[in-house]
Amino acid sequence: YFGQGVRVLYLDTGYELGHTAYDSLNLIAQYDFVNNDENTANETDQEILENQDNHGTLCLSVMAGYAPGNLIGPAFKSEYLLAKTEIMAEEIQQEEDNYVAALEWGESLGADIACASLGYLDWYSYEDLDGNSAVTTIAVDIASNLGVLCINSAGNEGDDPWYYIIAPADADSVISVGAVNRDGT
């Protein structure tokens, strides 16, 4: 089984779909919530191009990539909805609004799963991450109640001094995924 019959919404920075690992990607729809168009790759008329699609391309490949002998993602036969939600130049609250809009869009197109390796922290305190306050946390709970299985990274903070999960990983209806290095850090 390789994900047949499952529709996945993937939210991230953007995607370089010209990569050979995506030659057989079953792309149903894509939308750029940053620039309000249907191109989730780099666009030459955008102000910030650097690494615009790097994170999204890499993360999506873990799930959907198919390049025998190099990479085979576990769900390369799923149907995909791709949403570009992140503004690379800075961390701003608009990204959370984009995330929410993408969840609504994906749910309206029949997404079974919503997956993101994104999170929001800069404008929240530890106390705000209570599972009920962050905009994306509330949206993930609503999407889950509508039947969308939501999966999100626990955080993207790396070696930063913040050692807690970030929104929307604090939602009670999300599967939150984290990792540590070999030495436990």
Report the location of each language-model feature.
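Subtilisin-like serine protease catalytic core
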Residues: 1-95, 109-112, 145-147, 170-174, ...
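Catalytic-core segments of hydrolase enzymes
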Residues: 59, 99, 103, 108-185
